[in-house]
């Protein structure tokens, strides 16, 4: 236990060792982690990022450790990319379906039916109003 806490000591900044220690004790995986842990962390103590990377590689028992250290950038990118892609794809699909039949209309019957439904129910301006907000956010 002393070796485990000493090995987790340098990783104080990226991930709280007390929380990880409690997590390991609660899961009972402290024994399986105690052997690879001290070697990895004492070798890579100055580069705590790399140490946590090697930590979450071999055993999937400590996913939180690598999440806490080198996940933020990837998580930020992963959180942004689907968001922008969805809004861009959804916004453009919305735009091409709602506006282009009304404005140019590649095929005549779609333009006529779209205009008729637009004049009849006045439901089309609502998606049009939603579209800029969708694309912007």
Curated annotation (Swiss-Prot):
Glycosylated residues, chain numbering: 40
Originating species: Homo sapiens (Human)
Entry superkingdom: Eukaryota
Biased composition, class Basic and acidic residues, residue ranges: 121-137
GO CC terms in record: extracellular region
Bias (Polar residues) ranges: 33-45
Name of this protein: Putative uncharacterized protein UNQ9165/PRO28630
Keywords: Glycoprotein, Secreted, Signal
Protein's UniProt keywords contain Transport: no
Region of interest (Disordered), residue spans: 33-54, 98-137
Location(s), subcellular: Secreted
Annotated signal peptide: 1-34
